[in-house]
Amino acid sequence: MRVADFSFELPEALIAHYPQPQRSGCRLLSLDGPTGTLTHGIFTDLLDKLAPGDLLVFNNTRVIPARLFGRKASGGKLEVLVERVLDDHRVLAHVKASKAPKPGAELLLGDDENIRATMLARHDTLFELRFDDERDVFTILNAVGHMPLPPYIDRPDEDADRELYQTVYSQRPGAVAAPTAGLHFDEPMLAALQEKGIEMAFVTLHVGAGTFQPVRVDTIEDHIMHSEYAEVPQEVVDAVLACKARGKRVVAVGTTSVRSLESAAKAAENGLIAPFFGDTRIFIYPGYHYQVVDALVTNFHLPESTLIMLVSAFAGYKNTMNAYQQAVAEQYRFFSYGDAMFISRNPRAPQEKVSP
């Protein structure tokens, strides 16, 4: 399967640089997986598409202000993007500099360069840094860090992004990118869903910067997926099994919830799904047999990305690429701050051939 099969033309003007004034005010393109039928609407239409007893599974990770600017004590500007917090004082980070710092190098970070850190070791593309400060990592980042807006949002982060680039139900700090399908849910929408009898459960997947990395191979099967930490606790497993037992749908909010649930399904030796705590490298592309997820709420993804491959595996390749063509023609807003899709699973998708 070729990566180029997942390419599409996207006018620059359709990339959303700011969210809608109201979270649930975005547009919603619904795709019926079995038939390929498309319906245009607004996000609050989701209320009519869900039935009492359906289970919405959200990712409750919280984005940390993970981007720091500064310089090496020996000179030379650099940019640090924290990928993973290891403990109160150590992190794994991407470091962008004209010359990479060596072990033992001292870094002066923050807009005032008053945060000292030491480069301890290099692990492939990541640098292990220690903050030489009494405060813990999260306190430091909240004080001096910048929100790590995606590379396609071509503007500096603003104070408002600390709230806007965050789901209203986020609880567990650790992500460097938002689970963006969840950005559309506001408190009134969540209350309306509960009132209708929609069940809710929360997984955690700390989204890493790897989610924005382009696929650098020609053949999909050669791609090595980045690793992210996920948690699917027992209460989520119980909620999924209860939902299936009553004949209702498990609806994943975002591709990170999909990857968490399907990782937990892979971990189950007996039965449909088991608790999962650990790193996942699950890579879902056409041919994959979904085990847990029946429907999906998701944003519009980058051409040739692993995420459009995941959606194609769910809805079917032809359905997905047709939906994206229609979204461009109808001028939907794309990517993190853009519009949303609601997709029901296409049971024939795993057998479908991928051909443009």
Curated annotation (Swiss-Prot):
Task: Check the record and name the Gene3D superfamilies matching this protein.
Answer: QueA-like
Location in or out of the cell: Cytoplasm
What are the TM regions of this chain, as residue ranges?
none
Catalysed reaction(s) here are: 7-aminomethyl-7-carbaguanosine(34) in tRNA + S-adenosyl-L-methionine = epoxyqueuosine(34) in tRNA + adenine + L-methionine + 2 H(+)
Q: What GO biological process, any one, is recorded here?
A: queuosine biosynthetic process
On the tree of life, the source organism's domain of life is Bacteria
InterPro entries xrefs: QueA, QueA_dom1, QueA_dom2, QueA_sf
Its UniProt pathway annotation is: tRNA modification; tRNA-queuosine biosynthesis
Entry EC number(s): 2.4.99.17
Q: Which UniProt keywords apply?
A: Cytoplasm, Queuosine biosynthesis, S-adenosyl-L-methionine, Transferase
Main location, first listed in the record: cytoplasm
GO CC annotations, alphabetized: cytoplasm
Q: Which GO terms describe its molecular function?
A: S-adenosylmethionine:tRNA ribosyltransferase-isomerase activity
> What's the subunit arrangement here?
Monomer.
What NCBIfam families does its record include?
PRK00147.1 (NF001140), queA (TIGR00113)
Q: Which family does it belong to?
A: Belongs to the QueA family.
What does the record give as the function of this protein? Transfers and isomerizes the ribose moiety from AdoMet to the 7-aminomethyl group of 7-deazaguanine (preQ1-tRNA) to give epoxyqueuosine (oQ-tRNA).
Record HAMAP family: QueA
What's the name of the protein? S-adenosylmethionine:tRNA ribosyltransferase-isomerase
Write down the species. Yersinia pseudotuberculosis serotype O:1b (strain IP 31758)
Q: What is the lineage of its organism?
A: Bacteria, Pseudomonadati, Pseudomonadota, Gammaproteobacteria, Enterobacterales
Q: Which gene encodes it?
A: queA
